[in-house]
Amino acid sequence: MTYFSFRFLLCNSIICIFLGILLGLKRLLQNQLSARMQYNLSIIFLVVLIVPFFPIKSAPSSISWGHLLMPNSNTNGDIQTTFLSGNSYTLNKINDFAVSVSTQIPTFIHSLLVFFWSIGVFIMFVLLYHSAKQVKALHSSALPLQNEVINTLYIDCLNETNIKNTIPIYSTAFLKSPVLAGFLHPRIYFPIHLISDFNAGTINATDLRYMLLHELHHYKHKDILVGYLINTANVFYWFNPLIGYFLKRIRQERELACDSAVLQLLEETEYKSYGNTLINFAETIALTPFPLTMGISGNAKQLKGRILNIASFRKPTFTRDYEKKSVNNNLL
């Protein structure tokens, strides 16, 4: 435990350096990278946050595992051994540095650091557990959606997104905007007030279609799993403001990527209508109610960024070419 406290802080410093480089590159190339590509790069880096919790192997162990995993040959054997030895040497140097510095720091300092970190982890875990209980309570109070028109619209959206699995849709009085929840058993929860507004003619089927397409794309791209990873990282890195900013940014990139995925399904003439749906329901869909759910919501700054993304969105060239070929084939 004494060694872990310093190694964890050392890894945090190294991670922050690489994170700063990643954020700088993404800002530099923001006009060249699509919203989906930026989001995928963030997901890859999100996995890196697991590294501090893995033990560092010693050189002989790394080399022996390398020989087991990669068949040896006379020509490649020396190169393989040299490469693995070099990597193991570097890892061992980092390991030795962490151990040597940690031994110079009084034990009670290490214990104090671990104690305060553990308190923060416990508090964050309690908050996450409370959110999970809220989602469970939401499901207990929800009922299967009975509105036939919206159910038909939902089935059309499933077909439009090429989703073959059956995803149950429920109605609830405790939400202001639709959300997707559940990783093993995903469900969409639809607010009753939107159903009432639809029946009264206050909102139209197009608005509901956009909302449903948005939630279904969250499901299609496994955003629930990414959400769990983000919340887990939040628990263990609660003290690191740069990583906190990074995790908040991933959530925003997730919505931008989801918007872009929806826009790829729509005609260019519908982009403005999709943006208007976000603007018209900006107050209603102020925030996603629970950290463990996916929704179309966001704060004012995030909604502004999403509107700008919609305004500047252009379908990838291969998508436009595919649509032209489809039209030509239909004409023939």
What are these regions (language model features)?
Residues 1-123, 140, 159-166, 303:
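Hydrophobic membrane-embedded segments
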Residues 2-5, 31, 94-130, 268, ...:
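Cytosolic-facing loops and C-terminal tails of multi-pass membrane proteins
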Residues 25, 29, 33, 217, ...:
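Juxtamembrane interface helices immediately C-terminal to a transmembrane segment
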Residues 32-34, 56, 97-202:
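Juxtamembrane/interface helices at transmembrane-helix boundaries
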Residues 49, 54, 188, 229-244:
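Hydrophobic, aromatic-rich membrane-embedded alpha-helical segments
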Residues 55, 145-156, 160-164, 220-221, ...:
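Short helix/loop segments within enzyme catalytic domains
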Residues 206-230, 255-259:
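Active-site recognition of the HExxH zinc-binding catalytic motif
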